[in-house]
Amino acid sequence: MSGPGLLVELLGEKLVNSEREEADVQALGSRVSLIGLLFGCGMSAPCLQLLPGLKDFYCKTRDRLEIVFVSSDPDQKKWQLFVKDMPWLALPYQEKHRKLKLWNKFRISNIPSLIFIEASTVKTVCRNGLLLVKDDPEGLEFPWGPKPFCEVIAGPLIRNNSQSQESSTLEGSYVGIYFSAYWCPPCRSLTRVLVESYRKIKESGQKFEIVLVSADRSEESFKQYFSEMPWLAVPYSDEARRSRLNRLYGIQGIPNLIILDPKGEVITRQGRVEVLRDIDCKEFPWHPKPVVELTELNAVQLNEGPCLVLFVDSEDEGESEAAKQLIQPIAEKIIAQHKAKDEDAPLLFFVAGEDDMTDSLRDFTNLPEAAPLLTILDMSARAKYVMDVEEITPEIVQSFVTDFLAEKLKPEPI
């Protein structure tokens, strides 16, 4: 499919401007090289606050890019009032299904969010577009394509004894990029565990280093927090480099631990979950598994997009492992297909046993108590898809997933 065709598939054939006049998406794809998808809501104070600065940025760069507003407004009149103040385009209000697909595709968890994509390929250029606008308000670094880790991290790194070393010393090592701050209680809790994980990994003979990218609000709090850590940090004074690292990995919240391989490629963005799950670090460097067991630690991933969850009777010994083996070939195939296109898989895959967390999930989503129970949960759309049969086979799972991806299944409300 051609570039404009990919954009039409993503956004539909028509967008609207502030006067509700239609704009042709295929023509848009031929006119600009970048599209900024602005996820927001007219009832959100942060969304209202960002408009003046974003308008200035847009006026300076509109010959090279277009912004498309993707609304979360529950009321069309409020949407119309908000869109009226925007110099850019918007997804039509009635395109609610397409809006949800965009939220899921780009793993939007909070608003406002601004995602820059290539118009020709619809591949993501920058996940943290609002930070990009703040860092480069004149658009001097356009087109902001992702740079390799070694280039973004380049420069001196420090230890808490004030010793300095060049970032080039990280070459050939696994690296954990740790986004954290003293003012954040979950960060401090994770740091205590991470100090022990760091020690165990180093003692096992692995070449591993952690680099702190601070989100502290003062140099004093940074120094106090960093004094507890045996690893490296980007100097607090180097705000530009800290910001570039946040942009590179699309950081939306802390704590966040990104694990890189010795070539600087991302192994997992779920370092926090892995450190807390694998206390002895026996599975380091924590390559992602196609199917994982749903726990309190990773349940937050249910909010990242549609998730296939197979509920099983965990009192039956070996049932969870058998369920994983049943799903795994299907999960691997889907993950590989989308990885080849440099895309995230459209589904995450979980097996859920019986515990308090699973009971709470069943209650929240109003699922029957049956086991096995095959479901797809889409929390952002508040929708569920349920396959309640006596026996779950690979053929049933494959058919269920295929029909979901083809949008042939009828959702039930959560």
From Swiss-Prot:
Keyword NAD: yes
Keyword terms: Cytoplasm, Developmental protein, Differentiation, NAD, Nucleus, Oxidoreductase, Wnt signaling pathway
Main location, first listed in the record: cytoplasm
Gene Ontology cellular component list: cytosol; nucleus
GO biological process, one term: circulatory system development
PROSITE patterns membership: THIOREDOXIN_2
Keyword Transferase: no
Compartment list: Cytoplasm, Cytosol; Nucleus
UniProt domain Thioredoxin: residue ranges: 131-305
Loss of function: phenotype: Depletion causes significant defects in head formation with absence of eye structures.
InterPro entries reported for this sequence: NRX_PDI_b, Thioredoxin-like_fold, Thioredoxin-like_sf, Thioredoxin_domain, TryX_NRX_thioredoxin_dom
Catalysed reactions listed for this entry: [protein]-dithiol + NAD(+) = [protein]-disulfide + NADH + H(+); [protein]-dithiol + NADP(+) = [protein]-disulfide + NADPH + H(+)
GO MF annotation list: thioredoxin-disulfide reductase (NADPH) activity
Class in the EC hierarchy, top level: oxidoreductase
EC id: 1.8.1.8
SUPFAM superfamilies in UniProt: Thioredoxin-like
Task performed by this protein: Functions as a redox-dependent negative regulator of the Wnt signaling pathway.
Protein family (similarity comment): Belongs to the nucleoredoxin family.
Protein name: Nucleoredoxin
Organism in which the protein naturally occurs: Xenopus laevis (African clawed frog)
